[in-house]
Amino acid sequence: MKASFISGKRFVIGLPYAWLLVFFVVPFLILLRISVADMGSGAEPFAPLIDYSTDAWRLMLAFKNYIAIFSDGVGVSTIYVDAYKTSLKYAALTTLLCLVIGYPFAYFLARCKPSIRPGLLMLVMLPFWTSFLLRIAAWKGILADQGVLNNLLLWLGVIKAPMVMLYTDVSMLIGMTYVYLPFMILPLYANLVKMDLRLLEAAHDLGASSIDAFWLITVPLSKAGIVAGCMLVFIPAVGEFVIPSLLGGAENIMIGRVVWDEMFSSNNWPRASALSVVMIVLILVPLALFYRSKDTAEK
């Protein structure tokens, strides 16, 4: 009986690891394998790594795909490096905007009456019930020259001529912030709602103002939620390509769009895989910092 219980416990614990192995580790290894291969000929998108044509098998690793990312043979390859810089910049700005907007909302959500809390949570999750592309297309209609926002501002007399808002940095940031805002609010709310309010009462009894209590108690105690929300926003925002393509300008080339073009337009699977591997490595850095800060907070 005890042995079957232990084996069943191991099976349940092992399921998440098996899921991660099948859907994360194995695809990453496939991606890594393609990234060190040459371009294929004919219908094959990439060449094999092992040459079986001779008696002595040869392992053919092509690291030129990684070299081409950072060097074009003359100097630094500005196309790919600029795409990485642009992706990191807009992902960081999106994360900052989501934090600035999401923290007050999550704070209000955690402190409001329990009777209205489910309705507010439903409003946060409501966008997930509609198509991602439809939501972005709706923003195109709002931000267009003859769109809802320009017509409203003209009617109010705020502006005299339509403003150019679509296909700009601002429109792209609006779209990305709108899409990823729930990913910031939900972990912040989950963290703030569990906070012991007696700590704030004790701070007030000791003479602390509401602002001092917020910065000295609430914010430090919600650090785990802040970091979790930032990671949930930053990581997918780095590889975003749909929103920049539909709302951003031609100069806003992010790495997700570059990978798409290399894969489907140029049919250069090895180069696209190498770009993806480098992007994963860049994302692993803040992820490692997240787990390090989490361990420090728990200690």
Q: Positions of the model-derived regions?
A:
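Membrane-interfacial helix termini and adjacent extracytoplasmic/periplasmic loops
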Residues: 54, 136-177, 211, 247-251
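Transmembrane alpha-helix signature in integral membrane proteins
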Residues: 75-108
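Short membrane-interfacial helix/loop motifs at transmembrane-helix boundaries
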Residues: 26-78, 143-147, 249-250, 299
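N-terminal signal-anchor/first transmembrane alpha helix
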Residues: 1-38, 108, 118-124
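Glycine-rich helix-loop "coupling/hinge" segments at transmembrane-helix boundaries
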Residues: 241-269
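C-terminal transmembrane helix and the adjacent membrane-cytosol boundary/short C-terminal tail
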Residues: 2-3, 11, 189-204, 270-299
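Transmembrane alpha-helices
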Residues: 15, 126, 178, 184-198, ...
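Cytoplasmic-entry segments and transmembrane alpha-helices of multi-pass inner-membrane transporters
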Residues: 12-13, 104-139, 200-201, 214-215, ...
